[in-house]
């Protein structure tokens, strides 16, 4: 009286790979290019020479550049801005934060770890060093300086 309808769905994109070499050959061919992302649709934010010099000053770098180096920096910065604009245009409604696999570090864990450290002669850690042993004149655990500090 009741009939159960079962239908198997299948689809094909291409032929099945016959060997590992075919798979490797397929994976060698790029399917997309990052240069397509760098083609700017927006030119509203563009780095010009005064902005470049200001960025160099803020970074503590020299602003004395030859024309070729300056042009290269401008092209690189504009490409980065274009890429950032493209990334910001992507709408991301859902995202999941990746859970961390570790527990938070506690002060007691740090104390325990430092308590287990041993000195290594390979690193030049040879034991206790008392700088007062090197002083020719000392008094009550302090260096004694016999020079005048001011100019005469």
Swiss-Prot record:
GO biological process, one term: mitochondrial translation
Enzyme kind, highest EC tier: ligase
Membrane topology: Peripheral membrane protein
EC assignment: 6.3.5.-
GO molecular function: ATP binding; glutaminyl-tRNA synthase (glutamine-hydrolyzing) activity
GO CC annotation, single: mitochondrial inner membrane
UniProt xrefs under InterPro entries: GatF
Database matches in Pfam families: GatF
Role, per record: Allows the formation of correctly charged Gln-tRNA(Gln) through the transamidation of misacylated Glu-tRNA(Gln) in the mitochondria. The reaction takes place in the presence of glutamine and ATP through an activated gamma-phospho-Glu-tRNA(Gln). Required for proper protein synthesis within the mitochondrion.
Family indicated by similarity: Belongs to the GatF family.
UniProt miscellaneous comment: This protein may be expected to contain an N-terminal transit peptide but none has been predicted.
Entry protein name: Glutamyl-tRNA(Gln) amidotransferase subunit F, mitochondrial
